[in-house]
């Protein structure tokens, strides 16, 4: 399997400054629709949480929209949401068995590129403990592709990127799958305003910045724009 992160390592500066830009919630007002209409329903459906759907939705939205973990990788978010749901007295009172996924816990600890490609490879290689995680993740991707259309960028994004390009190399730094990023940026004709799109398959946001910008630009010339603590 080719390493998608090689594009980041090979990236060569063309300007004095570097600007990393998060996509969901920063360029596009897409966090709410993705998590409320795609992620949360698939969280309930594929982890058998129908009996506590109200509380499952609450914890999913808390983890991914309304707390310090906003914008985190979906696999970390899944573990955190299940942990919080397990602690909810409403779930305990209904004797609902909130699933645990030891294989997922082990995988997120050792895998640096938590994405579709590495998950597919794990399952294909015989990691049956991740099979249900793949079913859920694939369902989320299908829901996003089906539902999330016509979500424009925030006002003045194109103008801002155009101005930034005069002095800086601009790059998407995101934990969204690359396929979705490519589609959304192309749909809104913004893909020509950035040097590269880095998604979850290329590693964490910190790893993106280390490979693409660290030691290639002066530290004071590197800027990351985001909407969550994880973008810091």
Where are the model-predicted features located?
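Glycine-rich phosphate-binding "P-loop"
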Residues: 135-150, 189-201
């Amino acid at each position: 399997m080719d390493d998608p992160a090689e594009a980041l390592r090979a990236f060569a500066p063309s300007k004095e400054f570097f600007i990393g830009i998060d996509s969901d919630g920063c360029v596009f007002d897409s966090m709410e629709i993705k998590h409320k209409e795609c992620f949360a329903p698939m969280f309930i459906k594929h982890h058998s949480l129908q009996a506590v759907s109200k509380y499952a939705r609450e914890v999913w939205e808390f983890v991914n929209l309304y707390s310090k973990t906003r914008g985190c990788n979906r696999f970390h978010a899944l573990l955190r949401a299940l942990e919080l749901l397990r602690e909810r007295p409403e779930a305990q009172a209904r004797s609902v068995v909130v699933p645990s996924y030891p294989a997922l816990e082990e995988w997120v600890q050792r895998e640096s590129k938590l994405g579709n490609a590495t998950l597919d490879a794990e399952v294909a290689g015989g990691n049956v403990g991740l099979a249900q995680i793949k079913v859920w993740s694939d369902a989320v991707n299908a829901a996003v592709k089906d539902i999330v259309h016509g979500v424009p960028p925030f006002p003045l994004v194109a103008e801002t990127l155009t101005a930034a390009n005069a002095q800086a190399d601009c790059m998407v730094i995101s934990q969204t799958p690359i396929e979705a990023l490519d589609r959304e940026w192309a749909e809104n004709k913004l893909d020509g305003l950035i040097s590269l799109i880095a998604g979850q398959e290329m590693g964490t946001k910190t790893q993106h910045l280390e490979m693409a910008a660290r030691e290639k630009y002066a530290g004071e010339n590197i800027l990351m724009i985001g909407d969550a603590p994880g973008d810091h």
